[in-house]
Amino acid sequence: VLPIIGNLLNSLL
């Protein structure tokens, strides 16, 4: 899983 994907998910939360 790319770190950018995690950042996007965190932004939604």
Swiss-Prot record:
Subcellular location: Secreted
Biological-process GO terms, alphabetical: innate immune response; killing of cells of another organism
Record keyword Cytoplasm present: no
Record keywords: Amidation, Amphibian defense peptide, Cytolysis, Hemolysis, Immunity, Innate immunity, Secreted
Statement: the UniProt record of this protein carries the keyword DNA-binding: no
Tissue: Expressed by the skin glands.
Annotated positions of the Leucine amide modification: 13
GO cellular component, one term: extracellular region
Main location: secreted
Protein function: Has no antibacterial activity. Has hemolytic activity.
Record family assignment: Belongs to the frog skin active peptide (FSAP) family. Temporin subfamily.
Protein name: Temporin-1Te
